[in-house]
């Protein structure tokens, strides 16, 4: 029996980074169906591939990634959007979730990416702990 794979699309600013993410998923049940360099291309490709998950490395343009997340959330509500960032900042995480993201992962702190993505596809909202706001003191 052939294992079921889940289609994933990646947006990133460099071929090298996208290749590294693709290689991370080789021995998993994720199948990278497309890698693109900007949000507009991601939205267009999503119409064709209907991905289960879109992984956004937003380093070059946070605004572009937010716009893509909003469009994917509206046009493809079953696609889970995950931001994959070098920015360990609650402001970025909050903006990502407001734009429809299901996850916000910090690259330097993500040791088991495929496990986290699987949890997100099961409906969990995952946000790197360091990006959580500090509780206010009463």
Task: Please report, for each region that a protein language model flagged, where it lies by residue.
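Short, flexible helix-to-coil linker/hinge segments that flank and couple to helix-turn-helix
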Residues: 94-97, 108-138
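Short, conserved "switch-loop" micro-motifs in signal-transduction and mechanochemical regulators
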Residues: 87-88
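Acidic, metal-coordinating helix/loop segments flanking the phosphotransfer/catalytic sites
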Residues: 35-53
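Conserved phosphotransfer cores of two-component systems
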Residues: 47-49, 72-78, 99
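Conserved phosphotransfer microenvironments
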Residues: 55-70
């Amino acid at each position: 029996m052939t294992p079921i794979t889940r289609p994933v699309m990646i947006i990133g600013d460099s071929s090298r980074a996208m290749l590294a993410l693709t290689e991370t998923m080789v021995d998993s049940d994720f199948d990278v169906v497309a890698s693109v360099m900007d949000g507009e291309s991601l939205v267009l490709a999503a119409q064709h591939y209907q991905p289960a998950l879109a992984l956004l490395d937003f380093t070059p343009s946070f605004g572009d990634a937010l716009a893509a997340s909003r469009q994917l959330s509206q046009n493809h509500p079953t696609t889970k959007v995950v931001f994959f960032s070098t920015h360990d900042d609650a402001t970025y995480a909050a903006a990502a979730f407001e734009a429809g993201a299901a996850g916000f992962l910090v690259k330097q702190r993500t040791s088991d990416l495929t496990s986290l993505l699987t949890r997100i596809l099961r409906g969990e909202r995952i946000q790197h702990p360091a990006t959580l706001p500090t509780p206010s003191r009463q």
